[in-house]
């Protein structure tokens, strides 16, 4: 990383320093020029002529060449515990369905923080009533039956029970080099993190509970903290979005919350090393990818020394909140977040960027005559269900215009463009930002005016190339069951990042 003319050239992006508010706190924030300036440069896209876009070209390489990576790379897949009775065993329902030979980490989602005494008073209620923080907490499964109670034989291997922990125990022996992590939190289960971390006693109780679980299940290789997010965002603390969402209240001040996050990680790191040996158990944490909204509210430089990796959730970067169509998980979005954290003195080799195995679905208000990305959208999504890669493959197969992809060695590259000249699904690819999208202009279709931002082999290839070139730690996936039935994308990751280590 070099400094030139008051700007930082790092990881292939130019960033500038701005002051921005974080709740009621002013903090230094690194903002990419693509966020700070109006987007005006032409993008060379693969799309129908009517859908050429304009956007900031923010993927230009740094003036300094960076050597190809030398550090081991990681493929981290999240596995959702609620899928056991919602999906077929071999399609994400059971742990056995994970492509174990293509991953290096499996993060089990989720466990949660709860008051140890069983009280149901929320942290928000307790804080607003002027009560002191509780001091006894523990971690519990969000689905005990699926995790360890269900003794029904596995549909894949009837010799073992189908509950997740029984299968993890078996697969940890078969794949000893794969780290199985217990992920605590998640978007809807962050309601007690802040109150727990507010006092030393609360942190001690949480850490002790983690140690007890790791001792009971020795195949668990570490803890992944998915607190979304300490210190909140520029909007302040996150409010619940539904009956099943705890939100993420802040107990105390924004500054205290942020400091307590680092203290919690320090306590966890110390306990892990003392109980299991230095570096034996892993400790990771999830970070937002929003460089202008959420990341400024967390002091990752204070947290980093205690972590093996920081998993940047570089997805959901576009949505109804923008008012226009955009890219939810582009290569540029991943680069922006990585650059931001490197500027905060986070080692690049500790950073994982994210790959979403689902589409962000938006409803355009009308079919544009020109630009598609940046088109006005409705305030609602056209569907509530999660569109996985298998469903997307059907829309792609029906596309009336777009492009094909081929393999060149291990890498995936664009092959041929096509255009049937009719209405229907149209595939587009933003070369400058590394992002795939679909939209439908067939008035007779139930998908009329739909816009889908998604990951394909090309955008994923851009991320894998960036990881190798800039020596990042690797890639995270939300989540393994959303990939194609053949796990095509996870295998693309494993083949290129893990290679002979598989």
Q: What does each model-found stretch correspond to?
A:
Residues 74, 80, 253-295, 350-356:
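Aromatic-lined carbohydrate-recognition surfaces of secreted/lumenal glycan-active proteins
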């Amino acid at each position: 990383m070099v400094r030139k003319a008051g700007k930082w050239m790092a990881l292939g992006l130019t960033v500038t320093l701005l002051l921005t508010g974080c709740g009621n706190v002013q903090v230094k924030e690194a903002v990419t020029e693509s966020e700070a300036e109006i987007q005006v440069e032409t993008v060379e896209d693969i799309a129908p002529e009517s859908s050429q876009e304009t956007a900031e070209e923010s993927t230009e390489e740094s003036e300094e060449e960076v050597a190809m990576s030398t550090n081991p790379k990681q493929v981290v897949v999240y596995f959702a515990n609620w899928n056991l009775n919602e999906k077929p065993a071999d399609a994400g329902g059971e742990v056995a369905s994970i492509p174990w030979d293509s991953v290096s980490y499996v993060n089990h989602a989720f466990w949660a923080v709860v008051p140890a005494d069983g009280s149901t008073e929320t942290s928000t209620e307790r804080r607003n009533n002027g009560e002191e923080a509780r001091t006894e907490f523990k971690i519990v499964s969000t689905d005990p039956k699926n995790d360890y109670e269900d003794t029904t034989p596995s549909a894949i291997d009837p010799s073992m029970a189908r509950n997740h922990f029984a299968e993890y125990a078996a697969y940890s022996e078969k794949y000893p080099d794969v780290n199985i992590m217990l992920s605590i939190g998640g978007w809807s289960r962050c309601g007690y993190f802040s109150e727990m971390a507010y006092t030393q006693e609360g942190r001690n109780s949480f850490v002790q509970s983690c140690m007890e679980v790791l001792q009971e299940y020795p195949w668990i290789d570490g803890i992944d903290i998915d607190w979304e997010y300490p210190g909140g965002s520029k909007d302040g603390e996150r409010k619940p979005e539904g009956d099943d969402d705890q939100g993420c209240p802040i107990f105390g001040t924004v500054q205290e919350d942020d400091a307590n996050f680092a203290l919690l990680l320090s306590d966890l790191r110390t306990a892990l090393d003392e109980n299991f040996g230095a570096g034996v158990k892993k400790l990771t944490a999830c970070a937002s990818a929003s460089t202008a909204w959420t990341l400024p509210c967390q002091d990752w430089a204070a947290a980093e020394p205690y972590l093996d990796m920081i998993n940047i959730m570089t997805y959901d970067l576009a949505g109804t909140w923008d008012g226009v169509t955009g890219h939810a998980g582009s290569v540029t979005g991943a680069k922006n977040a990585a650059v931001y954290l490197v500027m905060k003195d986070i080692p690049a080799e500790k950073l994982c960027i994210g790959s979403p195995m689902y589409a962000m679905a938006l409803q355009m208000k009308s079919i544009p005559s020109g630009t598609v990305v940046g088109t006005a959208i409705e305030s609602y999504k056209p569907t509530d269900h999660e569109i996985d890669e298998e469903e997307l493959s059907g829309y792609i197969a029906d596309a009336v215009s777009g492009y094909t992809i081929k393999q060149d060695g291990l890498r995936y590259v664009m092959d041929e463009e096509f255009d049937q000249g009719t209405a229907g699904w149209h595939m587009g690819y933003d070369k400058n930002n590394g992002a795939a999208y679909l939209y439908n202009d067939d008035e007779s279709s139930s998908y009329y005016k739909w816009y889908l931002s998604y990951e394909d082999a090309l955008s994923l290839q851009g991320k894998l190339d960036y990881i190798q070139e800039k020596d990042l730690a690797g890639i995270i996936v939300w989540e393994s069951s959303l990939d194609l039935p053949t796990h095509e994308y996870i295998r693309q990751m494993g083949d290129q990042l893990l290679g002979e280590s598989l």
